[in-house]
């Protein structure tokens, strides 16, 4: 086999190595420089995006594994460096170009805002588990923690100390359990509080939507703060095409307030797709169900809104333990009743078709 053929096979193998943060082939990202093969030894220049790249070990391991599959290569000389500023700027410009209006009207990403009327109904826990369950089904999933004052998503997914990676003007979100995650908690010091007025909240949400590079997503879940305040209004303005999932408990007080959050979403043009009832009873050892918070709240809200009750998630110790440990119950205890209910919800949302109504198809009619 000629050296030219081996080099061609080597480039093809490296094209299968995916940057774990950007989720693109490293060859497409211009992270592979010179390649040469001499007497069975392959020489490869690898350019990381930044100094101290958190994905460096993973990328280097995957490169070595890819090279090992190439026939005719018996050894590897891997030179690891860092992109120059010009190369990094070119990469940033290229990535920004591929994500123009990444969540605009023409986007095929399904956006689901998860809302509740009041706090303490388990909205964030359900959102985190739903994101992980969708990712486990093979979907590309992003999760934005829009609960700026009460952020909890990083802890629920086991990445409380993770920080995003910056490449130029772009922010690359950490990945947890196959989900790309961004939260204001990744930019604050432990033990500090966030106390901002409306304009600052709006700019934060806007920056999450424009400067965070999620790549090509099938689904973006947004964990809203409870209530009908500034963030909900901002997201209604920025993402009028988004769908809304309403979370409540069976209790009448929670159900009444949850309905109001759905009505505000509708006023901004968003579509309420369904209701999820959390804490819907505790399964006893004898199989009976103890209704600690009453019953019927979710069904009542769904009926008044004219949407389906998509799931009824029972009280579960495993669900709480999964949130405390950062290992969502859908992964830690998939046979738990709460996990099964959340998996069924993910299946319902994953198989729901997305229409093309209102989207430009880019066709030139002559």
Please report, for each region that a protein language model flagged, where it lies by residue.
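Flexible beta-alpha connector loops of hexameric P-loop NTPases
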Residues: 54, 187-200, 246-253
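Extreme N-terminal, non-catalytic leader segments
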Residues: 28-31, 38, 49-52, 56-116, ...
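Short edge beta-strands and adjacent turn/loop segments
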Residues: 20-47, 313
């Amino acid at each position: 086999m000629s050296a030219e053929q081996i080099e061609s096979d080597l480039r093809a193998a490296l094209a299968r190595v995916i940057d774990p943060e950007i989720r693109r082939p490293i060859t497409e990202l211009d992270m592979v420089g010179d390649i040469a093969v001499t007497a069975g030894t392959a020489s490869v220049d690898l350019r990381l995006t930044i100094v101290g790249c958190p994905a460096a070990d993973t990328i280097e391991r995957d490169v070595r594994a890819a090279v090992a599959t190439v026939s005719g290569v018996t050894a590897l000389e891997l030179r690891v460096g860092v992109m120059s500023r010009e190369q990094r700027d070119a990469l940033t410009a290229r990535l920004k170009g591929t994500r123009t209006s990444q969540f605009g009207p023409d986007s095929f990403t399904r956006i689901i805002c998860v809302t509740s009327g009041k706090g303490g109904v388990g909205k964030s826990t359900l959102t985190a588990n739903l994101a992980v369950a969708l990712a486990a089904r093979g979907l590309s999933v992003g999760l934005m923690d829009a609960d700026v004052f009460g952020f909890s998503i990083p802890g629920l997914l086991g990445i409380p100390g993770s920080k995003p990676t910056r490449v130029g003007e772009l922010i690359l979100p950490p990945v947890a359990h196959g989900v790309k995650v961004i939260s204001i908690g990744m930019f604050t010091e432990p033990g500090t509080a966030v106390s901002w007025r409306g304009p600052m909240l709006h700019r934060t949400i806007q920056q999450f939507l424009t400067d965070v590079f999620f790549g090509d997503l099938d689904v973006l879940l947004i964990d809203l703060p409870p209530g009908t305040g500034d963030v909900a209004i901002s997201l209604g303005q920025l993402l009028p095409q988004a769908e809304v999932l309403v979370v409540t408990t069976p209790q009448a007080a929670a159900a009444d307030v949850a309905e109001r959050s759905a009505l505000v979403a509708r006023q901004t043009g968003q579509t309420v797709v369904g209701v999820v009832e959390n804490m819907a009873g505790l399964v006893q050892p004898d199989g009976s169900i103890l209704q600690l918070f009453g019953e019927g709240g979710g069904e009542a809200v769904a009926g008044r809104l004219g949407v389906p009750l998509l799931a009824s998630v029972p009280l579960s110790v495993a669900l709480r333990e999964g949130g405390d440990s950062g290992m969502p119950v859908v992964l830690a205890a998939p046979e738990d009743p709460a996990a099964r209910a959340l998996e069924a919800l993910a299946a319902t949302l994953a198989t729901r078709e997305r229409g093309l109504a209102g989207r430009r198809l880019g066709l030139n009619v002559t």
